[in-house]
C-alpha cells in the first residue's frame, strides 16, 4: 500500500510541476500581451465564473473603462479587443485556483496517511505557505497598475515571478529526491560555493528579466552584441536618484541583464569542466549537463528576442527556458545541500 501511495505522490508532484510551469508560461504571455489589468477586481470563489452573456461582457468592459489603462492607453479598444486581453488574465487566475485544489486535497490525504518523511513535510508546508501568499502577491501586483499610472510595478512583477519559480523548484527538488535513490555528490567546498554563486547570478538574472518585461526595456535596444552603437550604452548611469537607478533605469537594466547572462555562462562552464568527471551519479551528471545546455540555448533565444524587438512568442520561450534554468539550478543546489 505504501509503495502505491509513493507512486501516487510522485505522480501528484509531477502533475503539480507541469501545471505550475504552465501557469508561469501563461503569466508571461499575460504580461507580454499587456493583459494583466483587464480584470479590475479579485474574487477568490466567484472569480472563477467566466462571462457568459453579452451583458456580462459589456459589464466587465464598462468596469475596465473606469481605470487609467483604458483611459490613457486603450481608449480605442473594442469589445473584441477587450475579450482577447481578458481571456489571458482569466486563464492565469483560473490556473492559480486549479493549482490550489490540486495541491491541497492530496496534501491533506497524504498527510493523514502519514506518507511524508519529516523533511518532506517541512517542504510541503513551505509550499502551502508560498502558494497561499502567491495569489495575494499577484493581486498586489495588479493593484499597482490600477492607480493613476496604468503600468504594473516591475518590482512587484519580479516578486511574483520569483515566488512562482521558487515554488516550482521546491516541487522539482522533492520529485528528484523521491525518484532518484542515489544521493547527489557534493564534490568539495568549492563545488558548493561555485554553484551558490551561479544560483545567485541566475536569481538576479530572473529578477532583471522581470524588470526588462515590466519596463519594456528589451525594446530599448534591438542590436547585438552592441547596444546601439556601443558595447557600453550611453546614459547607462543616468538617473536622478542614484539608489533607485539600478531598479528603474531601463538602459542599466538591459545592460545588467546581459552581463548577468554572460556571467552565468562562464561560471556554469567552469563548474562543468572541473567537476562533471568527478561525479559518480549519472543522473546528477545529466542534471548538470542539462543546465549547461539550457544556459547556452537561453543566450541564443535571448539574442533573437532582442533582434526581433521582443516578439511575443520569442519572449515567452525566453521566459520558459529561464524558468527551467532556475528550477534545475536551484533543485541541483538543494540536492547537494540536503541529500
Regions found by a protein language model. Give the residues of each.
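Polytopic transmembrane helical bundles with strong interfacial aromatic enrichment
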Residues: 1-339
Amino acid at each position: 500500500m505504501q509503495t502505491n501511495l509513493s507512486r501516487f505522490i510522485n505522480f501528484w508532484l509531477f502533475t503539480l510541476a507541469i501545471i505550475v510551469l504552465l501557469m508561469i508560461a501563461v503569466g508571461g504571455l499575460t504580461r507580454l500581451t499587456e493583459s494583466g489589468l483587464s480584470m479590475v477586481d479579485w474574487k477568490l470563489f466567484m472569480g472563477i465564473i467566466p462571462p457568459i452573456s453579452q451583458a456580462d461582457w459589456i459589464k466587465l468592459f464598462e468596469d475596465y473603462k473606469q481605470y487609467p489603462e483604458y483611459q490613457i492607453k486603450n481608449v480605442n479598444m473594442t469589445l473584441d479587443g477587450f475579450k482577447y486581453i481578458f481571456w489571458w488574465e482569466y486563464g492565469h487566475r483560473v490556473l492559480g485556483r486549479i493549482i490550489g485544489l490540486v495541491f491541497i486535497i492530496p496534501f491533506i490525504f497524504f498527510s493523514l496517511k502519514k506518507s511524508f518523511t519529516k523533511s518532506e513535510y517541512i517542504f510541503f508546508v513551505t509550499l502551502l505557505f508560498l502558494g497561499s501568499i502567491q495569489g495575494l502577491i499577484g493581486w498586489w501586483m495588479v493593484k499597482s497598475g490600477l492607480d493613476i499610472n496604468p503600468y504594473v510595478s516591475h518590482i512587484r512583477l519580479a516578486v511574483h515571478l520569483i515566488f512562482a519559480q521558487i515554488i516550482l523548484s521546491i516541487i522539482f527538488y522533492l520529485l528528484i529526491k523521491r525518484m532518484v535513490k542515489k544521493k547527489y555528490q557534493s564534490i568539495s567546498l568549492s563545488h558548493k560555493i561555485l554553484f551558490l554563486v551561479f544560483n545567485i547570478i541566475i536569481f538576479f538574472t530572473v529578477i532583471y528579466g522581470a524588470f526588462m518585461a515590466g519596463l519594456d526595456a528589451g525594446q530599448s535596444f534591438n542590436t547585438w552584441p552592441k547596444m546601439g552603437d556601443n558595447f557600453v550604452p550611453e546614459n547607462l548611469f543616468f538617473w536622478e536618484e542614484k539608489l533607485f537607478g539600478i531598479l528603474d533605469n531601463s538602459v542599466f537594466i538591459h545592460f545588467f541583464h546581459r552581463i548577468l547572462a554572460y556571467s552565468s555562462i562562464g561560471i556554469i562552464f567552469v563548474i562543468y569542466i572541473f567537476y562533471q568527471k568527478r561525479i559518480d551519479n549519472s543522473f546528477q551528471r545529466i542534471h548538470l549537463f542539462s543546465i549547461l545546455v539550457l544556459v547556452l540555448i537561453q543566450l541564443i533565444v535571448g539574442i533573437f528576442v532582442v533582434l526581433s524587438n521582443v516578439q511575443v512568442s520569442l519572449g515567452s520561450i525566453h521566459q520558459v527556458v529561464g524558468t527551467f534554468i532556475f528550477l534545475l539550478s536551484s533543485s541541483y543546489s538543494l540536492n547537494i545541500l540536503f541529500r
